[in-house]
């Protein structure tokens, strides 16, 4: 699996220390193991997890500004766990409403020795944080409108950002953004061996 990861990282132009590579592989191994009982992801093949979960998450890293982030609706820890591994100097709160997912994430945190994550079982609209976050990240979580509605209280004002990971560019959603939200950028992401488009939408308060 290390050979496959190295190959993907090379194509993506990403350089990581060996420890982070081993942590990423350890995460995939745990996800594969727990998935059989917990049904955490529809991706069953660990090699495909490297593409569709690991690379698909860490290509976002260069675009994140700040040091405190929350991954809302993290599911089995995506993109929060891979990002926390490759960005050990930042802090990530991983939030999900399902107990079985949070139990899995506790095991990941313990086995990989991740001390820069905090795990929260809660609905996003019921969760508050002080201080607020530099960035609110979501992947396959909801429409932009729902994300902004449910998470409006989480980023620092005015400099905090919303980072939404999408497939095809969501022009219909971008056309109806609230007046107090500014579209900062739409970034086309290149994920090696991944079929289909990937876009990162970056929004901030006006």
Swiss-Prot record:
Keywords: Cytoplasm, Methyltransferase, rRNA processing, S-adenosyl-L-methionine, Transferase. GO terms for molecular function: rRNA (guanine-N7-)-methyltransferase activity. One of its GO terms (cellular component) is cytosol. The keyword Transferase applies. It holds the Pfam family GidB. It is an enzyme of class 2 (transferase). Specifically methylates the N7 position of guanine in position 527 of 16S rRNA. PANTHER family: S-ADENOSYL-L-METHIONINE-DEPENDENT METHYLTRANSFERASES SUPERFAMILY PROTEIN. This is Ribosomal RNA small subunit methyltransferase G. It comes from Yersinia pseudotuberculosis serotype O:3 (strain YPIII). The gene is rsmG.
């Amino acid at each position: 699996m290390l050979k496959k990861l190295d190959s993907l990282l090379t194509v993506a132009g990403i350089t990581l220390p060996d420890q982070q590579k081993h942590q990423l592989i350890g995460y995939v191994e745990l996800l594969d193991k727990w998935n059989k009982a917990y049904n955490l992801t529809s991706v069953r093949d660990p090699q495909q997890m490297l593409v569709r979960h690991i690379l698909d998450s860490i290509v976002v890293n260069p675009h994140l500004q700040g040091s405190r982030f929350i991954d809302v609706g993290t599911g089995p820890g995506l993109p929060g766990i891979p990002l926390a591994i490759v960005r050990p100097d930042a802090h990530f709160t991983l939030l999900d409403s399902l107990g079985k997912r949070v139990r899995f994430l506790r095991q990941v945190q313990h086995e990989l020795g991740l001390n820069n994550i905090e795990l929260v079982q809660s609905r996003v609209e019921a969760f508050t944080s002080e201080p607020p976050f530099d960035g609110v990240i979501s992947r396959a979580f909801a429409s932009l409108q729902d994300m902004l509605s449910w998470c409006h209280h989480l980023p620092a004002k005015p400099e905090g950002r919303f980072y939404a990971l999408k497939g095809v560019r969501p022009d219909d959603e971008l056309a109806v953004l609230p007046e107090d939200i500014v579209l900062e950028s739409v970034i086309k992401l290149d994920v090696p061996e991944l079929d289909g488009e990937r876009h990162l939408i970056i929004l901030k308060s006006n």
